Amino acid sequence: MTIFLQDLSFELPGGAAALKASKPLRTTLDARIIRAEDGTVRLQAKVRAISADHLDVFIAEVTYAGLFEADVADDDAAQRMVPFVMAELGVLTQKSGLGALRLPWPWLPRAAPLP
């Protein structure tokens, strides 16, 4: 089974990226708030895609860039955004099916296999 992350930003600036698989996937969503040493607050949403019949497991980590990078942002604001972001990711997952998770700009995707 091949799971790959296709970034369309070069072909379609502001377009979507997609996590696609040749067979259906089971996906789980998780989010966490990260406070950097410089005081920047960042919300990171993690999508884990697991094949139902293969051992190939990949994690796509997406970080919403710029949303919590201002001095006015704080942990409380980030906490209030978590349910909204998770709901959006859930809707995107359901709309596109378990085999394709679409991530709208400005989500910045990275994919890496788990050991």
Where are these regions (language model features)?
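N-terminal intrinsically disordered, cationic/polar leader segments
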Residues: 1-115
